[in-house]
Amino acid sequence: DSEEPSYIKLAGSANNYLNNRDGFLALWNDAAAAKGDQGSKFFITEITPSPEYLYSEYSAVEPGKRPADISKYALWYNVPVAKTGVSDTWMEYALPLGNGQLGTTIRGGIFKDELQFNEKTLWQGSTGNGGSENNSRGWYQNFGSIMVTDMSGAFSLDSEEKPVKEYVRYLDIINGVGGVNYKSSDEATTYARRYFTSATDKVLVAHYEAKGSDKLNLKVTFKPDTQIGAGKVTYADGGASFSGKMTLVSYNAAYKVLANEGATVTTDSLGIHVENAEWVNVFLAAATDFDATKAGCKSGEDAAKIAANVQERLTAATAKDYETLYKDHVATFSSYMNRTELNIAD
């Protein structure tokens, strides 16, 4: 191969360079050596990357059929977004949910399930008439994402072995509920997920369950958007949070993970780890100090109070069982969507 290997210079170093040589990380003492793979002093160590960062979806996903328990007003697909090959998954295939304050998009990943979310007052800008300002001055921001990674090993990342079977994802427009259904390779376990941004409890709820011989083994992490200047994510007691401040508003977001009795939920600096679970619920709340009724459009609440507001919402939601949260949301959301119906006859 006549192509020169790529290399990078180590930050703060006068003459140290790194390159990747056939799966090994090589350290060189000058650029010429790195480019030509020759020269004095170098050290080589084998690269062992984590599969979590190498892959976005399992290799084999077999399509399923339209679920029978969703309304006739529903969008459904039998392939995860990561398998569609589109360049902009958020714009083209992610399914949106919202309650007027908190919104999310779901992509239906099996290996990596990304729940991107935003909140309607997370605004990058200041008060006043924005019509005279540059287009980039103020705009609504993406808050971030919850990442739920499958750690079970039940499916294959790099071969057609152990395929995901009967996969389908959907958005029930009448009930304001998204979902993903699929089965294990041997069809001995049925997996189901339900997502909704509660119209009554004002939180995002993501419900994961496995019925059959296999259990859920998940890692849940927080990924703040890179454009909002968020502080470090803090993981503690089965939950996570982050906060920050932009030109006008200060903000906070937090989630809590719960699982059935008998499952193991542990927390470390890398995230929340759930093992041997039959069901897992993830609850998210987010808020800012924006208040259009106050001077300067600020509520006057400090960072601690904003965080307390978020935690109060989470505490109230997690005190209820999942079925109650689900039924309350569907009853309220569908009451709006069923107010009228237009039937255009053939």
What are these regions (language model features)?
Residues 3, 21-22, 31-32, 39, ...:
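Intrinsic disorder/low-complexity detector
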Residues 1-24, 34-52:
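Extracellular glycan-recognition/adhesion modules and their associated mucin-like linkers
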Residues 27-29:
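Beta-strand-rich extracellular passenger or scaffold domains
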